[in-house]
């Protein structure tokens, strides 16, 4: 019986360590800013991209990665999504209060 408990504990610890790594990498991706590419596809021959900021970065895209594409940083997308969820939730709550709390 103890061997089964020890085996279950080892499996649980292994899975928890893997989940911990996944959570850390997800948090790290959201909280870091990307520098982006400065030339697409390579310096001297490629197109010069703009400079990146804390709000956006440039990424090579298009046919043969010859064009510079504008991308928002991950934290900007998370913030916009959070504001969207808060806005929709407050709208729904206000609508429910208006319908249910009439005098």
From Swiss-Prot:
Disruption phenotype: Mild decrease in swimming behavior but otherwise no apparent phenotype. GO terms for cellular component: neuron projection; neuronal cell body; neuronal cell body membrane; perikaryon; plasma membrane; synapse; synaptic vesicle. Expressed in a subset of neurons and in body wall muscles. In the nervous system, expressed specifically in cholinergic motor neurons of the ventral nerve cord, a subset of cholinergic head neurons, anterior sublateral neurons, and body sublateral neurons (at protein level). It is found in: Cell membrane; Perikaryon; Cell projection; Synapse. Residues 1-16 form the signal peptide. Keywords: Cell membrane, Cell projection, Cytoplasmic vesicle, Membrane, Signal, Synapse, Transmembrane, Transmembrane helix. Residues 17-75 are extracellular. Residues 97-103 are cytoplasmic. The chain crosses the membrane at residues 76-96. It comes from the Eukaryota. InterPro entries: SUP-1-like. It is a single-pass type I membrane protein. May be involved in trafficking or stabilization of the vesicular acetylcholine transporter unc-17. This is Protein SUP-1. It comes from Caenorhabditis elegans. The gene is sup-1.
